[in-house]
Amino acid sequence: MTKDMTTGAITPLLVDFTVPLVLGNLFQLTYNAADSIIVGKFVGEDALAAVGTSNPLMTLAILFINGLCLGAGILVSTAYGAGDTQRVERQVSTTAIAGTVFSLVFSALCVLLATPLLRLMQVPTEILPIAVQYLRIVFAGLIFTFFYNFLAATMRALGDSKSALYFLMISSVLNIGGDLFFVEVLGWGSEGCALSTVLSEALCCVLCVIYIQCRIPVLQLGRRWLVFDSSLLRNTVQYGWTSAMQQATVQLGKIAVQAIVNTLGVNAMAAFTAASRIDDFAYTPQQNIAHAMTTLMAQNHGAGKKERVRQGFFCGLRIELVYGLLLMAVCLLFARPIISLFVDDPAVIELGVRFLRCASLFYLMPGVTNGIQGGFRGLGDLKVTLTSSMLNMGFRVLAAAILIPLLKAELRFLPVSYGIGWLSMLIYELPLLIRYLKEDKL
């Protein structure tokens, strides 16, 4: 099913689109967290630290691919909002062909570079082999990552955010079951978790293809899936590359921070891994609320409906703030039982609790910055989102480097560097937003 977001009441339309996105990411985060919980409980702290230190590199590759899909999805949304079905078809087929070639090459490079990249991150020698094996399995399955993210982004661009959620729910349950089977029953350790993740994502791809062929006429292309429109490739690459670089910049900053944490020892790494999984429950849904804003705004921008574009932007910001407040309260009140889900060691639990409580104090800031970025993406100005993300990560890493190695601060003070990064984003984004509003561009 598709949904025309250029008509109807703005608030219910945006909420209806946003909720499946948020739920989908919560399910995805749940099975990511399940990897950590199962590894931590059934394999041990070393394996948990290895999975945690591998996660930034794994996420970098996934987010880069997701960024390509997100950028192409904006073009699909704009064409769909304008009622240009032929352009939608050609945009989808061109992205599918170019993305397949890219993801295969990218996957091979990632597998080959897994060891040197982990060494660059200063991963301790005792957990390096575990981390390498985990990463290589995940990287080998990046073709499935591309196809799922591409198909899901395309459905969302056409206003269908619910279908991808249903597939992801099924995949999440199977992934958790696979984790338990491969790790607890077969004793395959962290490699079993990685294999379970890849297989569950492959299933998502199959389900998406079946659904599209049955329910979405505009994507039932048949042989037209093989149509490659070189005239659309330049815009696709420009949007996709800028969006991918924005996503990659954010993750590169996280990798640099992970490298700093790695100097604090295995206990700090395990605590950081557990707390960061909870952090993901704050940041990822906030990003997806912004993605919902992008879709609604892009469709209406393509249809030339400026007032609906503005209404969608401010409605999305309100949703961001409410979510940030709720999660802040939960993490402040229940930090200890949450961290205890991941590890049993009292020292690691104490480190994780202190980190999480400090991090939760800043949860409103990424809500605002993500909302503003969603607005600029919806208007097609991806350079603003890239620049602001670079500022965020640059200042975050600089602040972390000063706090931890130079001032010898404890792990719990690391989230202060996050706040400094988000503040730099706001200082850059707010004047541009005010200018857009004054010039009636938004």
Tell where the protein language model's regions lie, with residue ranges:
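Helix-terminus/linker motif at the lipid-water interface of multi-pass membrane proteins
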Residues: L26, T30-A49, L118-T125, F181-W188, ...
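Interfacial/gating helices of multi-pass transporter permease domains
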Residues: V39-T59, E126-I130, S190-C193, L232-Y239, ...
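Transmembrane helical elements of multi-pass membrane transporters/channels
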Residues: D16-D35, I137, S171, S200-C204, ...
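Short runs within selected transmembrane alpha-helices of multi-pass transporters and secretion channels
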Residues: C69, I137-R156, A164-S172, C193-C208, ...
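Residue-level signal for short hydrophobic patches within transmembrane helices
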Residues: T7, T11-T30, A34, L57-F64, ...
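Generic alpha-helical transmembrane segments of integral inner-membrane proteins
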Residues: V22, L26, T30, A34, ...
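Short alpha-helical transmembrane segments in multi-pass integral membrane proteins
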Residues: M1-T18, V76-G141, V185-W241, M297-F362, ...
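Small-residue-rich hydrophobic transmembrane alpha-helices
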Residues: L48-A108, T145-A164, A271-A335, P366-G380, ...
